[in-house]
Amino acid sequence: MVRFLLVFLFALLVPEMVMAESLTSLDMTGTQRGIFTVLIFIISYGFVMTEEFTHLRKSKPVILAAGIIWAHAAILAAEKGVPTEQMHAAFEHDLKEYAELMLFLLVAMTYINSMAERNVFEALRSWLVRRQFGYRKLFLITGVITFFLSSVADNLTAALLVGAVVMAVGADNPKFVSIGFVNLVVAANAGGAFCPFGDITTLMVWQAEYAEFFDFFKLFIPSAVNYAVPAAVMYFAVPDEQPKETNEEAVQLKPGAIQICVMFLLTIATAVSFKQALHLPPFMGMMVGLSVLMIYGYFLKTKYYVEGEDGFDIFNKVRHAEWDTLLFFFGVVFAVGGLGYIGYLELLSSAMYEGLGATTANIMVGLISAIVDNIPVMFAVLNMGVDMDLYQWLLVTLTAGVGGSMLSVGSAAGVALMGQSDHKYTFFSHLKWTPAIAGGYAASILTHYLING
């Protein structure tokens, strides 16, 4: 559920994203060994993209690829006579990024797990189900809720939470579930694009200081257009019917639920304040927030202790963090970093941004994000050291954030909902609406040009 709190977490953690500014690549892209590393990365990411079918956790092939890529990078550095210290500096650059990332995400995941255990998300799901909305009204409500929820949480959590509502209400109507899930994927990805806390790629751009915090809100209207265009087209295909009555009972929040939600928001504020005001790494602010949660957990466990029950155990919440996700990011950071050290990011930058121009290249980034996860794509763009103005950085933030909506496998939200839908929402049921989603993609780019260009 927490794979991407991801969504404002990663970018806060990368203090110096532009490798080209501080580290020199080997410029050995034409060697057999260099080409081999690219093939290794492609093969490993092929396994990531087929995780739904192979059930091989995405972290496993990417970590292996990262190790192989850096082993070959070290050999290439030795062959070129690069000092060991220089190679270590490039490697430690990636290590520093990942260490801060892991600690930051671990705290966020622990908070999300704590809120889930206190029935925060289940209570919201129950409330929506008990309202007994018609299918078309529910289509609009769930889409809007997902759009705004994903701007402060992440697209995966928002999609799974609201997706449970769609499944509960539309269990007997596969058509509604299918269209409703497409709607949620588009809404979740669009909602994360305009807020620095809404998507990892958005925060990566903010952390790299290519845009100020409030600059991203210039993308609100383009993001809304990106969602509204396909939603308007799909609305008329939604069954104009009333779902069957449900006997859903209200879910009660457990003691401390509201307090933990407030502490999570304060923890986020602390992390941002540590970075903005004190110039300290934001993961330190997150760790302070974790310590507060741990102390409050002790209070909950002692005050509400029931014999025979474990009670609130903060270390269980840490234990149930999504370690597959944390290790996946390890693989992404080191694999992309290794390719960058060999020289492939400079080569890609020359081909895309110098050959095609910034606007075309940034639009292509969104299209690539429909096939490849947007995090390594944006990580690569930032490490290219491309010289762009604010308009272009906001454009690539928008396209990388919403481009994944065009295919069900293009974002974490789509992949997760396919697994949740009991075969009612599939790759091909999503593909049916790709033209409408592509229309929203084009309309959002045009809107961005008209408003911010």
Task: Write out the residue ranges for each language-model feature.
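N-terminal secretory/membrane targeting signals
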Residues: M1-A20
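Juxtamembrane and boundary regions of transmembrane helices in multi-pass small-molecule transporters
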Residues: V2, E21, K175-S178, F194-C195, ...
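Hydrophobic core segments of alpha-helical transmembrane domains in multi-pass membrane transport
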Residues: F8-L13, V38-T50, A65-A74, L105-N113, ...
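Structural signature of hydrophobic alpha-helical transmembrane segments
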Residues: D27-I40, K96-V107, S150-A159, L219-P230, ...
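Hydrophobic transmembrane alpha-helices of multi-pass solute/ion transporters
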Residues: V38-T110, A123-W127, R131, F283, ...
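Membrane-embedded alpha-helical segments and adjacent helix-loop junctions characteristic
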Residues: V82-K175, D324-V386
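Re-entrant/interfacial helical elements at transmembrane boundaries that shape
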Residues: L124, T157-A168, F181-V182, C195-E209, ...
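Membrane-interface alpha-helices at helix entry/exit sites of multi-pass transporters
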Residues: S126, F133-T142, A171-N183, A211-P222, ...
